Regions:
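Hydrophobic transmembrane helix bundles of membrane-integrated enzymes that assemble
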Residues: 2, 8-29, 34, 44-209
Length: 209
């Protein structure tokens, strides 16, 4: 067991980690959505990450004691991931690691639910803004991905790439299924499949030109 003394979480620590999950999920999503650049500039996104890390750090060590072996393991893995992230100039894995260690002896369902709600909200906002921008013909170039010698045009729904939108949508479907796994029915899976197919065919824009 990583704990020397397993102390129950108080309400303050729960709120800390909830806020951290919201901030880090928000950062990971908006960094892939160019239409949010005017609302969440890069400096603001960096502030979100730093605040998220601080809150998780406070959450992990508040009124808890860990074994030396556990602390050394966490430091080594964190250092390795930080070095890798710096070399790759991509902090997704490092952020995911922080979120993972924060869930130790924590309600995983609560974490998944928060990520699901934040992701779904951001996706809805991105879809709405991108469709509005397309309709009023404002910066359409950031909404359309052109491939195969301009023969394939795909609507990004505000994301940096249509495949990124598909990944987030797939993650939402998986989280939805996991959250309702105790009462999962065939029509839930059918609904998720329908949503995936609907957006897959909707993003192809040949018919809009």
């Amino acid at each position: 067991m990583p704990y020397l003394n397993n102390v129950p979480q108080n309400k303050f620590s729960i709120r800390l980690f909830d806020i951290a999950i919201v901030l880090l999920t928000l950062k990971m999503l908006v960094s892939s959505i160019p239409v949010f650049d005017f609302v969440f500039p890069q400096k603001f996104q960096n502030i979100l990450v730093i605040l998220g890390y601080i809150l998780i750090f406070l959450h992990i060590f508040e009124k808890r004691k860990y074994t030396l072996q556990f602390i050394i393991s966490i430091i080594l893995i964190t250092t390795l991931l930080l070095y890798t992230s710096i070399q790759m100039q991509n902090y997704v894995y490092f952020t995911s690691w922080f979120m993972l260690i924060g869930t130790i002896h924590y309600d995983l369902r609560r974490v998944i639910k928060i990520i699901f709600i934040v992701s779904l909200s951001i996706m809805f906002i991105s879809i709405f803004i991108s469709l509005l921008m397309y309709i009023i013909d404002y910066k359409r170039e950031i909404l359309i991905n052109i491939r195969r010698n301009e023969t394939v045009r795909a609507f990004t729904f505000g994301f940096i790439h249509p495949n990124k939108f598909t990944i987030v949508l797939s993650n939402l479907c998986l989280m939805f299924i996991w959250l309702i796994k105790d009462r999962l029915k065939y029509y839930h899976v059918t609904f998720c499949l329908f949503i995936q197919l609907f957006f897959y065919f909707s993003r192809r824009l040949e018919q809009l030109y």
